[in-house]
Amino acid sequence: MYDLLIIGGGAAGFYAAIQANIENPKLKIAILERGKTVLGKVKVSGGGRCNVTHAAFDLITLTENYPRGKKELLGPFHSHSTGDVMAFFEERDVPLKIELDGRVFPKSNSSPVSYTHLTLPTIYSV
């Protein structure tokens, strides 16, 4: 029996599971994915470099990227936004860089770095 089921084994699903585990380490969490592999897009995102987030730090600017849900996203983005995502990787020794167009990538230009940090079962009980 699980306390939390996360539907979708992509980057957002794994990140949500990790954040839930950080908030409550005793949670039993399962990630359900209907595809053949989990985190498949992470390995190819940004031409194999893994676009981690976008450097929109102003919440209004950030919500403009989501025209169908910008009002609904203001609340969640007040709780967890771009800076939090970047801090997650940097606190785990994944230095990031911001490109001219605002995309944020690992300085290593390697998606396996991001992939590894999203799938550390010894740290996160997922």
Task: Mark where each language-model region is.
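Glycine-rich FAD pyrophosphate-binding loop
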Residues: 22-42
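Short beta-strand to alpha-helix junction loop
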Residues: 74-81, 102-115
